[in-house]
Amino acid sequence: MFIFFYLFATLITISSLCVVLSKNSVYSVLWLIFAFINGAGLMILLGAEFLAMMLIVIYVGAVAVLFLFVIMMLDMHFNKTITQLKENLALSSFIALIMFADLVTIILLGTKNINFISDVSFTITNDISNTKAIGKVLYTDFMLPFQMAGLILFVAMIACITLTLKKREGVKHQDITKQLSHNKSNVVLMTKPTLNKGVENIKYE
């Protein structure tokens, strides 16, 4: 069991470094998919096969493939990106050091007084399935954080739609209020065209 744990953990670390250090964006996404697959392996070792399946279906099957298609469709100029990074190398290094120091501080000092065996923790038994156990915890002890997470995702989705929704000139749109306000008098027009001359252009209000 420990051999597989160290194997998956090592592969996740290597693939994560390759995601950051790879010069090709497509290769970075492929390494990211490989990291997700190894993460699913760790979930299986923990006995959470449902989470492993969700990690494969959602992250690999949807998110990572979406990233891959977007990167392949966009014209990515890596040399230009490297030039921009070199211009801000000092600032980027300073921010990276601050974040690294923050993570080390949280790991060393932030978890010192935390009791990981709380009232919420429970022992997985064979009486209920893994999916039922996760659902029971999510909708009882963690109901409020779970609903808040869904609300945050909903707000983010609405914000993305609002930012990308632009009114373009020259494009015809339906005005439902104006269409419903029409009646027989301003929709039906009776004409008596002259023979072999046709009807002139009619402008509707």
From Swiss-Prot:
Chain coiled-coil ranges: none
Catalytic reactions of this protein: a quinone + NADH + 5 H(+)(in) = a quinol + NAD(+) + 4 H(+)(out)
Pfam (any one): Oxidored_q3
Record's bilayer topology term: Multi-pass membrane protein
Enzyme Commission identifier(s): 7.1.1.-
The protein's enzyme class: translocase
Molecular-function GO term, any one: NADH dehydrogenase (ubiquinone) activity
Subcellular location: Cell membrane
Entry keywords, A to Z: Cell membrane, Membrane, NAD, Quinone, Translocase, Transmembrane, Transmembrane helix
Known function: NDH-1 shuttles electrons from NADH, via FMN and iron-sulfur (Fe-S) centers, to quinones in the respiratory chain. Couples the redox reaction to proton translocation (for every two electrons transferred, four hydrogen ions are translocated across the cytoplasmic membrane), and thus conserves the redox energy in a proton gradient.
Family designation: Belongs to the complex I subunit 6 family.
Protein name: NADH-quinone oxidoreductase subunit J
Organism: Rickettsia felis (strain ATCC VR-1525 / URRWXCal2)
